[in-house]
Amino acid sequence: MARKKLMRFKWNDEVHNLFQPEKDNYKFYKGNWKEYFKNTNPIVLEVGCGRAEYTTGLAALNPDVNYIGLDIKGARLWKGSSLSIETGLSNTAFIRTKLQNLEEFFLPGEVNGIWITFPDPKPRESEAKLRLSGLRFMNIYRRLMPQGGKVFFKTDNKVLFDHTLEVLTNPDLKITNLVYTHDLYQSELLSEHYGIQTTYEKTYLKQGVLINYLKFEFLPL
């Protein structure tokens, strides 16, 4: 294994802001994230966060909101974890987990918002249940935010985006204020992103690929 990767794994094992299965406190804060953050500020998740550009970028802009990035790859989470510590961000945390296990880390009502940024489109029908913007995951997000909450979704994949719009027509999800664009960089919605771009996004933009974006709110149950 490359020396750099070993150093990153060692970092992940030792830092306080990254939770992974090998640590005793892996699921300790479920229902009690206010103890970790030392406040009762709103919690926003970035699911499939990769290098956590949105987790760290938004946390720097909004110190009164707590941001948690989740991903299955520890090597990706290292980036957000290390940047947070280097820049003094105390309102971030990172969790290494399969995203279908979200409810093992948060109680209903503990989450206020969710960002889904450039997820794997999982194009095969056999993988449909793994799409982070599919109905299975939307129902998970719904359960985490029974009091209502906002969801934000960005992707370069128009097929996935259109599929997501179809998913959101399901009346059981009880959503409102859906707004979307097939070309974010020609939309007034761009200002909501504060110049934050993921690594994938930068690559797609150089290739001339359009970026799709939507946001909506869950109605309180």
List the model feature ranges, each with a label.
Residues G48-G50:
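Class I SAM-dependent methyltransferase "Motif I" SAM/SAH-binding loop
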Residues K73:
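Conserved SAM/SAH-binding beta-strand->alpha-helix loop
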Residues M1-I43, E53-A60, S81-P108:
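S-adenosyl-L-methionine
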Residues P171-L221:
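Class I S-adenosyl-L-methionine
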Residues S133-Q147:
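A short glycine-rich, Lys/Arg-flanked "PGG" loop and its adjoining helix->strand segment in the class I
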Residues V65-I68:
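Short beta-strand element of Class I
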Residues G148-T155:
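Conserved beta-strand signature within the Rossmann-like core of class I S-adenosyl-L-methionine
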